[in-house]
Amino acid sequence: MNVRDVAQRTEPKMKKTIEAFQHEIASIRTGKATTALLDRVKVEAYGQQMPLKQVGNVGVMDVHTLMVQVWDKSMVSATERAIRDANLGLNPAADGQSIRVSIPPLTEERRKEFVKLTKKFGEDSKVSLRNLRRDMIHEIEKLEKEKAISEDDKNKGKKEADEMLHKFEKQLNDLIVLKEKEIMEV
């Protein structure tokens, strides 16, 4: 095992952290209709909590409206209730076997709350990235103690860990700035 092996094991984990962050912020409202808004909604169905995607299809009708096509007609009211109770500030209205979800414009105060939430998710992701870097450095130091690599290799490995961290933190910061712009856009 060498420094390259450690780096090759760490990089995919850092990529996964970025992907998890992207998934997390996709559900934050920006004032535009997007199916990701309802990703976290759980519906009480058949005696258990099920993701909305498992009880119906979600589609975008227009910029301010989502349409949820519920597969089982008996689940329409439970689905409508789940969307209303999800604390997303959305206004669902049953229409036969489907539900129209109106997305009201965001207030300035609500936009700022969503920006704060985005930054919080970003900070959590940065902590994860730093922990991965720390683990990588720890593994490299362990290799040096076991005499599997030289001190020069250890130093190069630490430098590579720092560079990898900076690369992924930059990606994360770019995503945060992009999401903030999206949220604050009126």
From Swiss-Prot:
Coiled-coil ranges per the record? none
GO BP of this protein:
translational termination
What the entry lists under Pfam families is as follows:
RRF (PF01765)
InterPro entries recorded: Ribosome_recyc_fac, Ribosome_recyc_fac_dom, RRF_sf
* Compartment list: Cytoplasm
What keywords does the record list, in alphabetical order? Cytoplasm, Protein biosynthesis
Q: Does the keyword Protein biosynthesis apply?
A: yes
Which GO molecular function annotation, any one, does this entry have?
A: ribosomal large subunit binding
Q: Which Gene3D superfamilies match?
A: 3.30.1360.40, Ribosome-recycling factor (1.10.132.20)
This protein's GO CC annotations: cytoplasm
Describe the function of this protein. Responsible for the release of ribosomes from messenger RNA at the termination of protein biosynthesis. May increase the efficiency of translation by recycling ribosomes from one round of translation to another.
Do you know which NCBIfam families this protein is assigned to? frr
The similarity annotation says: Belongs to the RRF family.
Q: What is this protein called?
A: Ribosome-recycling factor
